[in-house]
UniProtKB/Swiss-Prot annotation:
<dbReference type="GO" id="GO:0050480">
    <property type="term" value="F:imidazolonepropionase activity"/>
</dbReference>
<feature type="binding site">
    <location>
        <position position="70"/>
    </location>
    <ligand>
        <name>Zn(2+)</name>
    </ligand>
</feature>
<dbReference type="InterPro" id="IPR032466">
    <property type="entry name" value="Metal_Hydrolase"/>
</dbReference>
<keyword id="KW-0479">Metal-binding</keyword>
<keyword id="KW-0963">Cytoplasm</keyword>
<comment type="similarity">
    <text>Belongs to the metallo-dependent hydrolases superfamily. HutI family.</text>
</comment>
<feature type="binding site">
    <location>
        <position position="313"/>
    </location>
    <ligand>
        <name>Fe(3+)</name>
    </ligand>
</feature>
<feature type="binding site">
    <location>
        <position position="140"/>
    </location>
    <ligand>
        <name>N-formimidoyl-L-glutamate</name>
    </ligand>
</feature>
<feature type="binding site">
    <location>
        <position position="318"/>
    </location>
    <ligand>
        <name>4-imidazolone-5-propanoate</name>
    </ligand>
</feature>
<feature type="binding site">
    <location>
        <position position="313"/>
    </location>
    <ligand>
        <name>Zn(2+)</name>
    </ligand>
</feature>
<keyword id="KW-0369">Histidine metabolism</keyword>
<feature type="binding site">
    <location>
        <position position="68"/>
    </location>
    <ligand>
        <name>Fe(3+)</name>
    </ligand>
</feature>
<comment type="function">
    <text>Catalyzes the hydrolytic cleavage of the carbon-nitrogen bond in imidazolone-5-propanoate to yield N-formimidoyl-L-glutamate. It is the third step in the universal histidine degradation pathway.</text>
</comment>
<comment type="pathway">
    <text>Amino-acid degradation; L-histidine degradation into L-glutamate; N-formimidoyl-L-glutamate from L-histidine: step 3/3.</text>
</comment>
<feature type="binding site">
    <location>
        <position position="77"/>
    </location>
    <ligand>
        <name>4-imidazolone-5-propanoate</name>
    </ligand>
</feature>
<dbReference type="InterPro" id="IPR005920">
    <property type="entry name" value="HutI"/>
</dbReference>
<feature type="binding site">
    <location>
        <position position="68"/>
    </location>
    <ligand>
        <name>Zn(2+)</name>
    </ligand>
</feature>
């Protein structure tokens, strides 16, 4: 829990557009898992207790945060990948009973042990890319016991892996077959049964919903959000991925921490995000994997100074990409972000998307000592190089991890 880092080039990462702010030849003194002191080496204290690590002037950043994943599931959807490549759209696959429902069926049948083993395999890719905090959604159960099963596995991941986990209930991911003729009854079930049970079991931090033509409408979305808020939970939304439904504006006005995807977000929606402090989480992996062409309104987000986060959206159907460094590159090459914006997108802005902006995502005194040491000369290399093992070490709560 106590660790003295010396001879570091610190990339503090600020929430404002201030540049990289690299502090060369600095130390960080970590006490009880928190950053207690930062300064130049000339004023470096002696290591009175705990370990000492010479960073050898390598770059030190905040630990990365993947703020949108569907990490816990069974099976795969490689066959649908083949279908899409022959021209069958994702929406059509979903309407035919494929898509999310394919994964739901497999996940319902799987044991917690099976789900945990598979999730830890997926997580290993994120850990190699410097992820120290990960959000994990449910949404592949769509019934009470299966949704809780997924959330329990997410909690077990935090206990078994060196990582902080934020859990999100996404029971309103799709309408299960048993409710296919009455989606409103399913929303009743989500609001009156699943959300209260998840709260009682202390398994959930946020509630999410897929607000889209093939998902849930605005009225249903509002009902789910109201239920979540009544239990003191945070809210977030899958919005404006395939069409402009107004879900982002609704979520923002109701206090959402983030809205995610956003390819079809318009200026009205962007303004709502800005007015309510909601983070725009972009998911270039899904955009790439689905071969979409509608770009999210990055320039409008910049104009209105909306914080932009980036995440893998790791899932079996639309983004089986367990690399946050790859996502940073995609954010730059596909969406036109700068490498600096991409770095903020997986640190301070991702922390804000999870309600952790005062704890993680920056290198500041009083913050959790979640850090990454990289074998690079400049921060832009993080978004530039693909497939290179850039990470030297992760530090979580002041503990040096040997991943």
């Amino acid at each position: 829990m106590n660790l003295l880092l010396t001879n570091a080039s610190i990339v503090t990462v600020e929430t404002n557009d201030t540049g990289y702010l690299i502090k060369h030849n600095h130390f960080i003194n970590i006490i009880n898992g928190k950053i207690a002191q930062i300064g130049g080496m000339a004023s470096c204290p002696l290591a009175s207790s705990g370990k000492q690590l010479d960073c050898e002037h390598k770059l030190l950043t905040p630990g990365f945060i993947d703020c949108h994943t569907h990490l816990v599931f069974a099976g795969n959807r490689a066959n649908e990948f083949e279908q899409r490549l022959t021209g069958v759209p994702y929406q059509e696959i979903a309407r035919q009973g494929g898509g999310i429902m394919t994964t739901v069926n497999a996940t319902r049948k799987a044991t917690e042990a099976q789900l945990l083993e598979k999730a830890l395999q997926h997580l290993s890719g994120l850990i190699k890319d410097g992820v120290t905090t990960v959000e994990i959604k449910s949404g592949y159960g769509l019934d009470l016991e299966s949704e809780l099963k997924i959330l329990r596995v997410a909690k077990q991941i935090e206990q078994q892996a060196n990582i902080k986990v934020s859990t999100t209930l996404l029971a309103a991911h799709a309408v299960p077959l048993e409710f296919k003729d009455n989606p409103d009854r399913y929303i009743d079930y989500v609001c009156n049964t699943i959300i209260p049970a998840a709260v009682k079991a202390q398994l959930v931090d946020y509630v999410d919903i897929f607000c889209e033509g093939i998902g849930f409408n605005l009225k249903q979305t509002e009902r789910v959000f109201k239920s979540a808020l009544s239990f003191g939970l945070g809210i977030k939304g899958h919005t404006e991925q395939l069409s402009n439904s107004g879900g982002s504006a609704l979520a923002a006005k109701m206090g959402a921490s983030s809205v995610d995807h956003l390819e079809y977000l318009d200026e009205t929606g962007v303004k709502a995000l800005a007015d309510n402090g909601t983070v725009a989480t972009l998911l270039p992996g899904a955009f790439y994997f689905l071969r979409e062409t509608q770009l999210p309104p990055v320039e409008l987000l910049r104009t209105y100074k909306v914080p932009i986060a980036l995440a893998t959206d790791f899932n079996p159907g639309t983004s089986p990409i367990a690399s946050l460094l790859m996502i940073m590159n995609m954010g730059c090459t596909l969406f036109g972000l700068t490498p600096e914006e991409a770095l903020r997108g997986v640190t301070c802005h991702a922390a804000k998307a999870l309600g952790l902006a005062q704890q993680r995502g920056q290198i500041k005194v009083g913050f959790e000592a979640d850090l990454c040491l990289w074998n690079i000369q400049h921060p832009a290399q993080l978004a530039y190089e693909i497939g290179t093992n850039l990470l030297i070490s992760r530090i979580i709560n002041g503990v040096l991890c040997n991943d």
